[in-house]
């Protein structure tokens, strides 16, 4: 009879005994602890989730029917209350956008379990891809169970929550949409929780280097930090743009924000870096060394630490080429107008100004005369360039059989020779003629026509006829427009 009370006492002690959860247990919320949520979270962290075969794709690729089947499977697997599937009429991409509060709103009795289950499935899928020298298994994937002990059913707070591991960062990164969880506990140069020494492995990941830099004073501030975090239970959604094709670290005042970064796929795409690529990442505000320190030797704050975690799944800049900028018309080693026109015709950026009508026949059209004149003036550093002046320079080439205007067609021209033929045929004569006329007509740069000056005998003009004077004037203006640097 004496053994029965002893045995019952031992059993009672086994049931009532609970291991210490954290050094900050005294700062928990006054709300009673819901013990039934803890075993579920721990069980999902420790055990593998065996989904049906048709649900073993990444959740981002789930269809609406797959989401409904997943809800039905979870309801049976975990003995949950009936889940209204019409509250989750969405595909896998949309499902990943939901916060824990969204899950609770759609399913008040089972939303928290569904959310944790989804996170564990994502982590389990990604863990098969991340075991590499750059992703140590002990540091990158698994988290100690005691770190994940939930205090109550209504608040999404942890006793000592470590920053998001690379696995958690990666599974929120589909090809064109980027979800980034902010840690619940802000880690700045003034507030840092104490790291778990058991989590420091011989193999070091970028996150390990940060935790080793914490001072004893900073470790002692963990209880106060947890008390502050009890008031941060909402996680609003916000859209964060990408500036200059770099993933910008958020400010320390936005640690409770769940950020969704939308990025066009042709410019930026996610890439799991290996050691070869890890040294080529350029963050906008600071560049960090491998041990998690900035150039001044000070430990970096939360946003920079999250950047280091994001090295495991970084958005690599794929900057569009500079040619997509607005063309300014400057072309190197191009002095003459006919050559400049050829260069513009060969560049698709200038099709709004000038383009080929028939490339085989060398027929081209000036689409925007005034715009083309501005390009030519910019190339020659002439702000007062107009199409009237440029057209006189074009007419100069009529006489040399280089360019001809198409009869009866406005702004339609034809090259009579290829650039090689022009350069090899009459280049010397062209240079000599342009140089000679330039010397005689320098002072008449902006005159539309050339008239005989008072007191200047007609015989001293370049040619002896009035028509010759006009031709020489046109030639002089054309040459002046081209040769003035």
From Swiss-Prot:
Residues 1-10 have a biased composition (Polar residues). Residues 41-125 form the PNT domain. GO terms for biological process: cell differentiation; hematopoietic stem cell proliferation; mesenchymal cell apoptotic process; neurogenesis; positive regulation of transcription by RNA polymerase II; regulation of DNA-templated transcription; vitellogenesis. Residues 335-416 bind DNA. It is found in: Nucleus. Transmembrane segments: none annotated. It comes from the Eukaryota. Keywords: Acetylation, DNA-binding, Isopeptide bond, Nucleus, Phosphoprotein, Repressor, Transcription, Transcription regulation, Ubl conjugation. The modification N6-acetyllysine is found at residues 11, 298. InterPro entries: Ets_dom, ETS_fam, Pointed_dom, SAM/pointed_sf, WH-like_DNA-bd_sf, WH_DNA-bd_sf. Residues 1-32, 157-210, 440-485 are annotated as: Disordered. It holds the Pfam family SAM_PNT. There is a cross-link at residues 11, 284, 298, 399, 417 (Glycyl lysine isopeptide (Lys-Gly) (interchain with G-Cter in SUMO2)). One of its GO terms (molecular function) is DNA binding. One of its GO terms (cellular component) is cytosol. Can form homodimers or heterodimers with TEL2 or FLI1. Interacts with L3MBTL1 and HDAC9. PANTHER family: ETS, TRANSCRIPTION FACTOR ETV6. Belongs to the ETS family. Transcriptional repressor; binds to the DNA sequence 5'-CCGGAAGT-3'. Plays a role in hematopoiesis and malignant transformation. This is Transcription factor ETV6. The lineage of its organism: Eukaryota, Metazoa, Chordata, Craniata, Vertebrata.
């Amino acid at each position: 009879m004496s053994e029965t009370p002893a045995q019952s006492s031992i059993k009672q002690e086994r049931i009532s005994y609970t291991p210490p959860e954290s050094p900050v247990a005294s700062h928990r919320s006054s709300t009673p602890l819901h013990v039934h949520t803890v075993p579920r979270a721990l069980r999902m962290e420790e055990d593998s989730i065996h989904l049906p075969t048709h649900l073993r794709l990444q959740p981002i690729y789930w269809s609406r029917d797959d989401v409904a089947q997943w809800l039905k499977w979870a309801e049976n697997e975990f003995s949950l209350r009936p889940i209204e599937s019409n509250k989750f009429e969405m595909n896998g991409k949309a499902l990943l956008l939901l916060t824990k509060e969204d899950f609770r709103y759609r399913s008040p009795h089972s939303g928290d379990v569904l959310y944790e289950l989804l996170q564990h499935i994502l982590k389990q899928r990604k863990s098969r891809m991340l075991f590499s020298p750059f992703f140590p298994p002990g540091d990158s994937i698994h988290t100690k169970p005691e770190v994940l002990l939930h205090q109550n059913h209504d608040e999404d707070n942890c006793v000592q929550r470590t920053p998001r591991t690379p696995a958690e960062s990666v599974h929120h990164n589909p090809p064109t949409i980027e979800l980034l969880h902010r840690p619940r506990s802000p880690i700045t140069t003034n507030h840092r929780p104490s790291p778990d020494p058991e989590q420091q492995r011989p193999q070091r990941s970028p996150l390990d280097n940060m935790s080793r830099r914490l001072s004893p004073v900073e470790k002692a501030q963990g209880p106060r930090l947890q008390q502050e975090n009890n008031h941060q239970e909402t996680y609003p959604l916000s859209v964060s743009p990408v500036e200059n094709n770099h993933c910008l670290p958020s400010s320390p005042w936005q640690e409770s924000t769940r950020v969704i970064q939308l990025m066009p796929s042709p410019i930026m795409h996610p890439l799991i870096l290996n050691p070869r690529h890890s040294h080529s990442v350029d963050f906008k505000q600071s560049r960090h060394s491998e041990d998690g320190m900035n150039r001044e030797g000070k430990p970096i704050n939360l946003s920079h630490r999250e950047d280091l975690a994001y090295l495991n799944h970084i958005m690599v800049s794929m900057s569009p080429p500079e040619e997509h900028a607005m063309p300014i018309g400057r072309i190197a080693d191009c002095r003459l107008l006919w050559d400049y026109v050829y260069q513009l015709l060969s560049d698709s950026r200038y099709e709004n100004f000038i383009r080929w009508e028939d490339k085989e026949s060398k027929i081209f059209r000036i689409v925007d005369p005034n715009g083309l004149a501005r390009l030519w003036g910019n190339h020659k550093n002439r702000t007062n360039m107009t199409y009237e002046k440029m057209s006189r320079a074009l007419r100069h080439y009529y006489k040399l059989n280089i360019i001809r205007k198409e009869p009866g067609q406005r702004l339609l021209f034809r090259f009579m020779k290829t650039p090689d033929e022009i350069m090899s045929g009459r280049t010397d004569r062209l240079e000599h003629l342009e140089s000679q006329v330039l010397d005689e007509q320098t002072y008449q740069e902006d005159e539309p026509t050339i008239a005989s000056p008072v007191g200047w005998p007609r015989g001293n003009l370049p040619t002896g006829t009035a028509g010759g004077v006009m031709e020489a004037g046109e030639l002089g203006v054309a040459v002046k427009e081209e040769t003035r640097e």
